[in-house]
């Protein structure tokens, strides 16, 4: 029988993600819109980060390169977007992360961001993975909606073979026919058995691809139930998108948590994690 490797904790600035560490929470708006909005959300996340049982990273995209429609808004672009992320980092003290879509974006993003993210649709793109890992930054790679959790071993191998910044794998749902995603919670322990901390993306898991015609729909009321299941089964980190007024977000509004509900949602999840940790004590 092949021995299961120990999970290798991932260091993100002063944070550590892995077994026995405070819950890592990656959160923010889906896409960067303005400096004012980014700082508003970042300041609320920094307030939450004062808790001792959580480690918060600010996340937002500078380009939504896989939008459903050509007419959909994509974001401010890499130059302006990285400037906004730098402002959030400087004003809140939070680590920041964003996703990259092309290998040539990796170096510039690695200069600003503390963690690089690989979108699920691009999880098997070798050149992108190699470029991300080569920055020396830790990488959070989302499991493709079309992939089995066991097949993520090859993705992890590509990243580990190209850099030593650390790897996290993220569960964000699996295609279930057309326009629907489901979560197989077995994915969390299976991917942890690859020796990496596992993130659960609670808001993208409730997406309904193409559910609004030229845009993606979603069901935010299912975000917390799924996040509770992920915490109960032992995820190392949670991922959420949040916005003061989700209906005005250019992307993913239907599955985002309203900012004024985020702290309460997280508090309940942290109390659940404390109870789960007690079972292992």
Swiss-Prot record:
One of its GO terms (cellular component) is cytosol. Disulfide bonds: none annotated. It comes from the Bacteria. It catalyses: D-arabinose 5-phosphate + phosphoenolpyruvate + H2O = 3-deoxy-alpha-D-manno-2-octulosonate-8-phosphate + phosphate. Keywords: Cytoplasm, Lipopolysaccharide biosynthesis, Transferase. Pathway: Carbohydrate biosynthesis; 3-deoxy-D-manno-octulosonate biosynthesis; 3-deoxy-D-manno-octulosonate from D-ribulose 5-phosphate: step 2/3; Bacterial outer membrane biogenesis; lipopolysaccharide biosynthesis. One of its GO terms (biological process) is keto-3-deoxy-D-manno-octulosonic acid biosynthetic process. It is an enzyme of class 2 (transferase). The keyword Cytoplasm applies. It is found in: Cytoplasm. Its EC number is 2.5.1.55. One of its GO terms (molecular function) is 3-deoxy-8-phosphooctulonate synthase activity. Signal peptide: none annotated. Belongs to the KdsA family. PANTHER family: PHOSPHO-2-DEHYDRO-3-DEOXYHEPTONATE ALDOLASE. HAMAP family: KDO8P_synth (MF_00056). This is 2-dehydro-3-deoxyphosphooctonate aldolase.
């Amino acid at each position: 029988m092949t021995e299961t490797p120990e999970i290798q904790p991932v260091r993100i600035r002063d944070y550590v993600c892995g077994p026995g560490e405070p819950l890592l929470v990656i959160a923010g708006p889906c896409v960067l819109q303005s400096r004012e909005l980014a700082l508003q959300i970042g300041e609320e996340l920094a307030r939450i980060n004062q808790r001792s049982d959580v480690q918060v990273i600010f996340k937002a995209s500078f380009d939504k390169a896989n939008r459903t429609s050509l007419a959909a808004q994509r974001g401010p672009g890499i130059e302006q977007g990285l400037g906004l992320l730098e402002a959030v980092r400087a004003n809140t003290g939070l680590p920041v992360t964003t996703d990259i879509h092309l290998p040539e974006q990796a170096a510039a993003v690695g200069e600003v961001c503390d963690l690089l993210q690989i979108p699920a649709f691009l999880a098997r793109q070798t050149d992108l993975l190699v470029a991300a890992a080569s920055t020396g930054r830790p990488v959070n790679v989302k499991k493709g909606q079309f992939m089995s959790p066991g097949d993520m071993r090859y993705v992890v191998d590509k990243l580990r073979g190209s850099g030593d910044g650390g790897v996290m794998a993220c569960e964000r749902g699996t295609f279930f026919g057309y326009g629907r995603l489901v979560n197989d919670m077995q994915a969390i322990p299976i991917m942890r058995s690859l020796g990496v901390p596992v993130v659960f993306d609670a808001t993208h898991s409730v997406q309904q691809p193409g559910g609004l015609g030229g845009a993606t729909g979603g069901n935010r009321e299912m975000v917390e139930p799924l996040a509770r299941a992920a915490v109960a089964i032992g995820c190392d980190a949670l991922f959420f998108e949040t916005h003061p007024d989700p209906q005005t977000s250019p992307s993913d509004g239907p599955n985002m948590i309203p900012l004024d509900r985020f702290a309460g949602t997280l508090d309940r999840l942290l109390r659940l994690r404390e109870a789960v940790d007690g079972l292992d004590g």
